[in-house]
Design a protein with these regions (language model features):
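Active-site acidic Asp-centered loop
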Residues: 35, 87-89
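Short, well-formed alpha-helical segments that are part of the catalytic scaffolds
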Residues: 13-26
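Catalytic core and acceptor-binding pocket of nucleotide-sugar-dependent glycosyltransferases
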Residues: 93-98, 110-233
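N-proximal low-complexity "stem/linker" segments adjacent to membrane-targeting elements
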Residues: 1-16
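Active-site-proximal specificity loops/subdomain of glycosyltransferases
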Residues: 33-78
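Short, polar loop motifs at secondary-structure junctions
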Residues: 13-14, 33-40, 115-120
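Short aromatic/hydrophobic "clamp" motif used to bind/position activated sugar donors
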Residues: 84
Length: 233
């Protein structure tokens, strides 16, 4: 385990992935933040914290970003370590010590996965949200500021990752949260200033989940990259 790091597993979890988390990280600091109706009767380690919350009143029609924000903030509220890594309950990653080590090297930048990290300029402030690692305070800032944006203003596109990426920078740079286009011309510089990418294929074996018109797609090795994906800045 890493004493000053907590894994926050958020959202609905799937049995295969959660069993892998239990098998590989039973002695780590872990918070599982899920929903009241998610119950697979698994034997969770006694040192883990399990939070089952009521669903929030929906506040954003955008790929369940409101559920991600709520479950993540619920989980972060139970964290007592300096650093956290937010992951999804329908995914699994091995070797998270590598993420932690790189995060320390690039701090105060936030370290995110390479999954769906869009090329600079393709979409404003589009990071990846499949895992996010930084100080616990930084993660709280990111998700709380995104909550403020979506409950008090309007979404500026249909990408949850853009709102998370922009909101954190807004908080750090003291920008106007409700006018992303005012900062469009500094997108590339600010992404490089505040974020870095971890190439996910270093974390095999893994399970990565993606939605598609035909249903969920799962990747278990050699996650590829196309014209809409990058793995380094």
């Amino acid at each position: 385990m890493i004493e000053d790091l907590t894994i926050v597993i958020q959202g609905r979890y799937e049995e295969e992935q959660m069993k892998l988390w239990i098998e590989n990280y039973s002695d780590w600091n872990v918070v599982v933040s899920t929903w009241i109706d998610c119950d697979l009767n698994l034997d969770f380690p006694k040192n883990w914290k399990i939070i089952k919350s009521e669903y929030p009143k929906r506040f954003a029609d955008m790929q369940n970003i409101d559920l991600q924000i709520s479950s993540t903030l619920n989980g972060l509220s139970e964290v007592n370590t300096k650093y956290s890594i937010k992951v999804r309950g329908d995914e699994f990653f091995s070797n998270l010590h590598l993420v932690y080590e790189k995060m320390l090297q690039i701090h105060p930048k936030v370290l995110v996965s390479s999954i769906f990290f869009r090329p600079l300029g393709l979409y404003l402030y589009h990071i990846s949200d499949h895992f996010i690692c930084s100080t616990t305070d930084n993660l709280k800032i990111m998700f709380q500021t995104t909550y403020d944006l979506l409950t008090k203003g309007d979404k500026f596109n249909n990408s949850p990752e853009s709102h998370l990426g922009f909101s954190f920078i807004c908080a750090k740079e003291n920008w106007n949260l409700y006018d992303v286009y005012q900062y469009a011309d500094v997108n590339d510089n600010m992404i490089k200033k505040w974020y870095d990418i971890f190439e996910v294929n270093q974390l095999q074996p893994y399970i990565i989940s993606e939605s598609s018109p035909e249903g969920r797609i799962y990747y278990r090795d050699n996650y590829g990259y196309g014209s809409h994906h990058i793995y380094e800045l």
